[in-house]
């Protein structure tokens, strides 16, 4: 599979943003200008609106990290943070290795910002097969640094999160194919409830630049490799 160009990436950003009824404006539509909406001094949502979105799209589900630590999806991983999220599984031999290697490059480009200004999360789609040890070894193989956490949990909980953050198709046949859920990255600013997505095979420097727009809207971008 070829690495996607910027034109390809923008053309594929039709993946639906998270949205809840009357507060759908809280989520940035996936577009070329979406990140420009995250501006210094922007007002956070009301507590009521933020809670409403959280309850539908950011469930407080228990998970386990690659270190064996028990965490809650919303309270511990997402609340008050800038995050990126994707799905994979260890024995995937097609798209997953390419996307995960690309994310490793994104982390290198962002450097110490990951774990401080941005938190990266990768969830296994096969929690019955991928043990905590498997996640830890996979992470080590990729050379992942602090700030990039691999996660597992009960199969039904992983499925709940997958659907809640928008990695779900209405066609049950397509939705049941795990390879349909491993090619995209969901990213967002939780305090402002601004969310979008990008293809995991876009150029790593463009993904990093997009994430930096979310973190630091008016500072110099990462150096392209």
What kind of region is each of these model predictions?
Residues 98-161:
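Structural microenvironment flanking redox-active thiols in thiol-disulfide oxidoreductases
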Residues 144-206:
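Thiol/selenol-based redox catalytic cores and closely related redox-interacting motifs
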Residues 58-59, 83, 182-183:
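Short loop/turn microsegments at loop-to-beta-strand junctions
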């Amino acid at each position: 599979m070829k690495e996607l160009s910027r034109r390809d990436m923008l053309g594929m950003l039709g993946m639906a943003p998270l949205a809840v009824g009357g507060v759908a404006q809280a989520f940035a539509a996936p577009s070329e200008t979406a990140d420009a909406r995250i501006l210094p001094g922007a007002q956070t949502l009301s507590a009521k609106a933020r809670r409403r979105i959280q309850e539908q799209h950011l469930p407080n589900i228990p998970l386990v990290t690659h270190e064996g630590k028990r965490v809650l999806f919303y309270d511990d991983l997402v609340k008050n943070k800038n995050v990126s999220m994707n799905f994979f599984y260890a024995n995937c031999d097609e798209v997953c290795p390419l996307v995960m290697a690309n994310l490793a490059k994104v982390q290198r480009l962002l450097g110490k910002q990951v774990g401080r200004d941005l938190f990266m999360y990768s969830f296994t789609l096969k929690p019955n097969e991928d043990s905590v040890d498997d996640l830890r070894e996979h992470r080590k193989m990729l050379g992942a640094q602090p700030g990039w956490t691999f996660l597992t949990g009960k199969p039904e909980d992983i499925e709940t999160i997958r659907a809640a953050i928008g990695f779900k198709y209405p066609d049950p046949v397509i939705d049941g194919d795990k390879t349909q859920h491993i090619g995209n990255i969901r990213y967002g600013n939780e305090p402002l409830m601004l969310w979008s997505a990008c293809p995991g095979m876009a150029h790593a420097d463009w993904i990093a630049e997009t994430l930096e727009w979310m973190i630091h809207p008016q500072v110099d971008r990462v150096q392209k490799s």
